[in-house]
């Protein structure tokens, strides 16, 4: 007999509508044509049908294989042999997809690439610049990995002037070892703290790595700093409140809280489904 626990039945408030077939197929075909990855597909996101049906997607750059193995995520994990080389044309294709989808808000994220010296920061910056050129009226949000905690890499992303700099804490401190075994809560919090300080025009707290200086420039409209976490993994309300307090102390502008949904059997099971009333309390 299998020792994998059965999946919990989803409550009524989590049921979603069937996707609109024509727009769903059109979005998927465009992404295939441009050879782009999306979180919707690679991470088996439960909102894929809704997003594709409305002609939107979250672009996933730097390949479809991650150097880490977070236990909530269905993205493929692999070592150096399974990682793709950087694709210099990828930023252009992301921008072209955004233009053809007529997106008003473009979200760009990535797998974690611990093998790259800058963690992929330059590719993020190039993607932001490409979207700015092809779709100047759109806002751009980057959802970045922790970049190994490297200040110069973070500064390079901020120098591209995204409208939103997002880095997800994902879960509470106590659950990090189980949920994100290769990440560190306080390193991620420091990414948010530095991003918020630099977005407000403060100088970097310490010099970046040797090489050309890449400080985050002051901008007329500073980027919003954002984070997110999942609930339903076994955390308590007090632990969630502690994360929110940490974000407030780090001057984070926005925090999203969402229900964790198990994307596939190899991932962590849902500990419980959080009722809508509890989400209202977090607000």
Where are each of the predicted segments found?
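Core AdoMet radical
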Residues: 74-93, 98-196, 226, 230, ...
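Canonical Radical SAM [4Fe-4S] cluster-binding loop centered on the CxxxCxxC motif
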Residues: 7-14, 50-90
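Low-complexity, compositionally biased segments
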Residues: 67, 149, 154, 166-173, ...
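Short, glycine/serine-rich, charged loops/turns that create anion-binding
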Residues: 66, 112-115, 147, 234, ...
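Short polybasic linear motifs
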Residues: 201, 209, 215, 219
């Amino acid at each position: 007999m299998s020792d994998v626990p059965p999946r919990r039945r989803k409550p009524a408030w989590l049921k979603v509508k069937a996707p609109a077939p024509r727009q769903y197929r059109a979005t998927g075909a465009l992404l295939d044509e441009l050879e782009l990855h999306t979180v919707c597909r690679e991470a088996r996101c439960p909102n894929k049908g809704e997003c594709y049906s409305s002609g939107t997607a979250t672009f996933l750059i730097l390949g479809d294989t991650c150097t880490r193995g977070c236990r909530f995520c269905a993205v493929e994990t692999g070592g150096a042999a399974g990682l793709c080389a950087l694709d210099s044309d990828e930023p252009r294709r992301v921008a072209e997809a955004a233009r053809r989808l007529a997106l008003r808000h473009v979200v760009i994220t990535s797998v974690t690439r611990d093998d790259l010296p800058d963690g992929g920061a330059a590719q993020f910056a190039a993607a932001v610049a490409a979207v700015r050129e092809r779709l100047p009226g759109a806002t751009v949000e980057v959802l970045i990995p922790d970049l190994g905690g490297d200040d110069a890499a973070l500064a390079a992303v901020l120098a591209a002037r995204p409208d939103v700099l997002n880095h997800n804490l994902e879960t509470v401190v106590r659950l990090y070892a189980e949920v994100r075994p290769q990440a560190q809560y306080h390193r991620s919090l420091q990414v948010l703290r530095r991003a918020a300080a630099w977005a407000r025009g403060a100088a970097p707290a310490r010099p970046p790595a040797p090489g050309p200086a890449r400080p985050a420039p002051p901008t007329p409209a500073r980027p919003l700093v954002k984070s997110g976490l999942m609930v339903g993994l076994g955390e308590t309300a007090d632990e969630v409140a502690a994360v929110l307090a940490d974000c407030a102390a780090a001057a984070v502008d926005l925090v999203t809280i969402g229900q964790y949904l198990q994307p596939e059997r190899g991932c962590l099971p849902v500990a419980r489904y959080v009722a809508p009333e509890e989400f209202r309390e977090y607000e």
